[in-house]
From Swiss-Prot:
EC id: 3.1.1.1
Keywords: Hydrolase, Serine esterase
Molecular function as annotated in GO: carboxylesterase activity
Organism classification: Bacteria, Pseudomonadati, Pseudomonadota, Gammaproteobacteria, Vibrionales
Protein name: Esterase FrsA
InterPro entries: AB_hydrolase_fold, FrsA, FrsA-like, FrsA_esterase
Species of provenance: Vibrio parahaemolyticus serotype O3:K6 (strain RIMD 2210633)
Length: 415
């Protein structure tokens, strides 16, 4: 994308949204729930509305120095905020606003791409796409700025796809009178390859996964297929229900018709809520899956502990409400509704084991995915394993554990 085209697209998309409602103010709560949130805000010492995913973003290819640069510009902004205590709630689309600053960084990477060729240019465009995606984080349904940022993320990704030496094809799978859009990444096209279906969480897009393919799967001649969770990104038409794996199951059942992949060698990787969907799919389609990795996946504990759900930061509650399509949120009622999402309550983690080996992994002290959840998954999987990443070596531990998990998956697939 030339600098002028990129600038024009950004200006066209955002010109109507100079005074767009700020993200943290979008979700409406019932009076009793609003009181719970207000009381909690006074007790807690949170400086940000959003959960800052520094480790994940760095692993996905963002420079920590650039990341801190953006965060410091947001933090030091003198513009008015929706919540004075939360640094990332600057109102209006201008300097200091979360979306504005991340879009600005994304456009900087697009500019760099113009001066480069081939793989170097592609890498800059994929990084730009990641910046645009973070600009829309946590991707609430009625967030106009986030929706515009998503348009830029998809455009930059498509342009990166044209420049890279690898082949990226958009696959369309018919489902409930619509089409599921997935991106198939191929290291080569002269033979059928093993394939890994990857799903991110409820607050990120499938276009965030480029580095996973480039650094891990491509060197081993493994294809990667990305699918958005229901209610997010390309899958935003479908509401999220306890049948969290419905879209991925539909895509899995179409793999035999894709000539580039070996549908007898299919692996799964799920991050956060995507892990819930992938574990579920490993029980439903045991004959079609060779191995599964779930990273930080909530499968039981969180859903059956209403008090834990009620104590979640506002961003997570806003995001869940958005995914469930709620316009006015009653926290207690929503916590009760989530009980049905437990894979144990659904009967998967309570009787028979799945043949699929599952590696369940999470950070030590993770409130969303406690070690007990991972142990439960490992217990009901043949050759399943549960692993905990020590928080003492969190930066190193995060990367090493992800590398270890992907290597384990490759070994299972290539047996």
């Amino acid at each position: 994308m030339s600098e002028d085209v990129s600038k024009n697209l950004s200006e066209t998309l955002f010109v109507k949204h100079k005074q767009a409602k700020e993200t943290s103010a979008l979700t409406q709560y019932m009076p009793t729930s609003k009181k719970i949130l207000d009381d909690r805000e006074q007790q807690e010492d949170r400086a940000w509305y959003r959960h800052l995913r520094r480790l994940q973003w760095a692993w996905q290819g963002l420079s920590p120095i650039e990341m801190e640069g953006v965060l410091s510009r947001i933090a030091s902004s003198t513009h008015s905020r929706t919540h004075d205590d939360w640094l990332d709630t600057v109102m209006g689309y201008h300097s200091g606003n979360w979306t504005f600053e991340w879009i600005k960084l994304g456009m900087e990477h697009q500019r760099r791409a113009n001066d480069l060729k081939g793989e170097d240019a592609a890498d800059e465009l994929f990084t730009a796409s990641l910046c645009f995606s973070i600009a829309g984080y946590p991707h609430l349904k009625n967030d106009n700025l986030a929706l515009q940022a998503q348009v830029l993320a998809n455009k930059a990704y498509s342009e990166g796809a044209e420049k890279t030496q690898y082949t990226i094809k958009q696959i369309e799978v018919p489902y409930q009178k619509r089409k599921i859009i997935a991106n198939l990444h191929l290291p080569r096209t002269d033979k059928q390859l093993p394939v890994v279906m990857v799903s991110a969480g409820l607050d990120s897009l499938q276009t965030d996964m480029w580095r996973l393919f480039r650094n891990h799967f491509a060197p081993k001649d493994i294809a990667m297929l990305t699918v958005d969770m229901p209610s997010v990104g390309h899958s935003s038409h479908w509401p999220l229900t306890e049948d969290s794996s419905c879209l991925h199951q539909a895509v899995l059942n179409e793999l035999y018709s894709i000539p580039y992949v070996d549908h007898h060698k299919v692996g799964l990787v799920g991050f956060r809520f995507g892990g819930n969907a992938m574990v579920r799919l490993s029980f439903l389609e045991q004959e079609k899956i060779k191995a599964c990795v779930a990273l930080g996946a909530p499968v039981h504990d969180l859903f059956t502990s209403p008090k834990k759900l009620q104590k979640m930061p506002k961003m997570y509650l806003d995001m869940l409400a958005s995914r469930l399509g709620k316009s006015a949120v009653d926290i207690n009622s929503m916590a009760g509704q989530m009980m049905a999402w437990s894979l144990k309550v659904q009967g998967f983690l309570s009787s028979r084991k799945t043949k699929v080996p599952i590696l369940a992994l999470s950070l030590e002290g993770d409130p969303v995915s406690p070690y007990s959840d991972n142990q439960l998954v490992a217990l009901f999987s043949h050759y399943g394993q549960a692993k905990k990443i020590s928080s003492k070596t969190i930066t190193k531990g995060y990367e090493q554990s992800l590398d270890l998990a992907i290597k384990w998956l490759e070994d299972e697939l290539l047996r």
